[in-house]
């Protein structure tokens, strides 16, 4: 009987034309994709996408935050997108953003992971972890940052010292055109390095420069089209050369750098006298040798890299935007310098306490953040359980993107939404906080380094404005054009830093 059945199947298989098999296979895959991605009842409206890739090719990967704005007008303040294998919704408007990120944050607390991100982090660290791992790592990171100076005079003094190193590095340019990218990266990175590694690096240190270069590359390469194709077809793309392979190589080199730093720490580690984040983490690991918590070597590497990345890229990118806008708006730069001269003078180092007496400078920094808009769709969240938002059903696993671009350019909130205008943050000459200003997000998953970033921005920006006037090079035109990556950064440009007399 079995032999007869097998013979019959073999006969049928042999009779089938390869074209028939191909059509059957494609039909099966299309049906599987349809049933996997079909919209549930009360799901937010949105554009129909192609099988397997969804709406990816309907977005401009050079400016995805801008290409979704017409969809807001068409579908409303909450609409859906299918980004390959990831179902997502985009929310627009302060009321909806507040509801999603604060009032309902227990339901929308997780972090979605692309295939690429999961391979890189394995759900570890601070940025891309969720659940108990995230809670443990965030609590420990906040405590350790405070223990090693956050909000204290000691860290402020480190910022002042680093600002003086940055001033001297820029002074060496002698007022000639230069690219400020890595000078600023060096300075900002050294602050978080002093907390994580317990030391600052010389600006010419080859290991330090290599680490910053690798980080800068992955910031851009992770958002390229070929990287997105890897997220959709990893079983194919892993065999194909391309920029996605460089992303993995770079992250392995970054992990190796941190691993070597950890080994160096172990050589003279004293658990009773932790010097930095790595020492403190090593001590925490000894409390849980059975790996009952997330305090293990893999999380130490990932959390250290997350602090290094978050503590370097966002602040340094904002400072680069700040210098660019000062060169583009010399009248604003003059007002900032006049306030600095009046409150601080030309000799004394800037202090955080000066910020209260410098409303215009503070307003300029905030306006740079608004216009720079460096994380235009916020860091994504993921729905942890089936949730209803604004009358729409969001199934568990849906990615939530926050439309900060629309919020920071809302004509109902800002007098001149598309024009650099520090008056947005001033009222009767005093600094004015704005509710529709969320560069650090909101809720429990808001940026844990917000206080550090605000302090760095003020100290570094004020120190540079105190010592230099920034101008466009002769016969070179500057513009606020951006390069898309994990953050929006200014396109590569040169600038002149003329010492002030």
From Swiss-Prot:
Q: Which PANTHER family match?
A: CYTOCHROME P450 2J2, CYTOCHROME P450 508A4-RELATED
Database matches in CDD domains: CYP2J (cd20662)
Q: Which GO terms describe its molecular function?
A: arachidonate epoxygenase activity; heme binding; iron ion binding; NADPH-hemoprotein reductase activity; oxidoreductase activity, acting on paired donors, with incorporation or reduction of molecular oxygen, reduced flavin or flavoprotein as one donor, and incorporation of one atom of oxygen
Give the EC class as a word. Answer: oxidoreductase
Name used for this protein in its record: Cytochrome P450 2J6
SUPFAM superfamilies reported for this sequence: Cytochrome P450 (SSF48264)
- Return the InterPro entries for the record: Cyt_P450, Cyt_P450_CS, Cyt_P450_E_grp-I, Cyt_P450_E_grp-I_CYP2J-like, Cyt_P450_sf, Cytochrome_P450_fam2
**Where found, per UniProt?**
Endoplasmic reticulum membrane; Microsome membrane
Highest taxon, organism lineage: Eukaryota
Keyword rRNA-binding on entry:
no
Any keyword Iron-sulfur? Answer: no
* Keywords, ordered alphabetically: Endoplasmic reticulum, Heme, Iron, Membrane, Metal-binding, Microsome, Monooxygenase, Oxidoreductase
| This enzyme's EC code(s) | 1.14.14.1
Catalytic activity, reaction form = an organic molecule + reduced [NADPH--hemoprotein reductase] + O2 = an alcohol + oxidized [NADPH--hemoprotein reductase] + H2O + H(+)
Gene Ontology annotations for the cellular component aspect, listed alphabetically: endoplasmic reticulum; endoplasmic reticulum membrane
Give the Pfam families listed for this entry: p450
Name the family the entry cites: Belongs to the cytochrome P450 family.
Q: Where are the transmembrane segments?
A: none
PROSITE patterns the UniProt entry points to: CYTOCHROME_P450
Which residues does the record give as heme binding sites?
447
Q: Which cofactor does it need?
A: heme
């Amino acid at each position: 009987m079995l032999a007869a059945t097998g013979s019959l199947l073999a006969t049928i298989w042999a009779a089938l034309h390869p074209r028939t098999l191909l059509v059957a296979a494609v039909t099966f895959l299309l049906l599987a994709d349809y049933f996997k991605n079909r919209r549930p009842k009360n799901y937010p409206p949105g554009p129909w996408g192609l099988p397997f890739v969804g709406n990816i090719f309907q977005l401009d990967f050079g400016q995805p935050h801008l290409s979704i704005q017409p969809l807001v007008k068409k579908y409303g303040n909450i609409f859906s997108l299918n980004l390959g294998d990831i179902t997502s919704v985009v929310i627009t408007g302060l009321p909806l953003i507040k509801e999603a990120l604060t009032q309902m944050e227990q339901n929308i607390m997780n972090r979605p992971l692309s295939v690429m991100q999961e391979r890189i982090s394995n759900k570890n660290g601070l940025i891309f972890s969720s659940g108990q791992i995230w809670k443990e790592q965030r609590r420990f990171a906040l405590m350790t940052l405070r223990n090693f100076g956050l909000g204290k005079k000691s860290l402020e003094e480190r910022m002042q010292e680093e600002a003086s190193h940055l001033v001297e590095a820029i002074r060496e340019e002698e007022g000639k055109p230069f690219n400020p990218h890595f000078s600023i990266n060096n300075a900002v990175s050294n602050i978080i390095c002093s907390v994580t590694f317990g030391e600052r690096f010389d600006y010419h240190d080859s290991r330090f420069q290599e680490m910053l270069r690798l980080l800068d590359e992955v910031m851009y390469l992770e958002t390229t089209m070929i990287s997105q194709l890897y997220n959709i077809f990893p079983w194919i793309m892993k065999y194909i050369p391309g920029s996605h392979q460089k992303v993995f190589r770079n992250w392995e080199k970054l992990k190796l750098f941190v691993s070597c730093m950890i080994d160096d720490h172990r050589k003279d580690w004293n658990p009773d006298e932790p010097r930095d984040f790595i020492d403190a983490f090593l001590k925490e690991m000894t409390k849980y040798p059975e790996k009952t918590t997330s305090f293990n070597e893999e999380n130490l590497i990932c959390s250290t890299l997350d602090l290094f990345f978050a503590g370097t890229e966002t602040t340094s990118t904002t400072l680069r935007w700040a210098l660019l806008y000062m060169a583009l708006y010399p009248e604003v730069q003059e007002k900032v310098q006049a306030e600095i001269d009046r409150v601080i003078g030309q000799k004394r180092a800037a202090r955080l306490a000066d910020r209260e007496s410098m409303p215009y400078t503070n307003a300029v920094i905030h306006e740079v953040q608004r216009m720079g808009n460096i994380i235009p769709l916020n860091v994504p969240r993921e729905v942890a359980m089936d949730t209803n938002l604004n009358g729409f059903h969001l199934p568990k696993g849906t990615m939530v993107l926050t439309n900060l671009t629309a919020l920071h350019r809302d004509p109902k909130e800002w007098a001149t939404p598309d024009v650099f205008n520090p008056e947005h943050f001033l009222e009767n000459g005093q600094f004015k906080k704005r509710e529709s200003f969320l560069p650090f997000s909101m809720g429990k998953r808001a940026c844990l380094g917000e206080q550090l970033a605000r302090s760095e921005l003020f100290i570094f920006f004020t120190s540079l404005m105190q010592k230099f006037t920034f101008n466009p090079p002769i016969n070179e035109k500057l513009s606020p054009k951006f390069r898309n990556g994990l953050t929006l950064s200014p396109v590569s440009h040169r600038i002149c830093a003329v010492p002030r007399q």
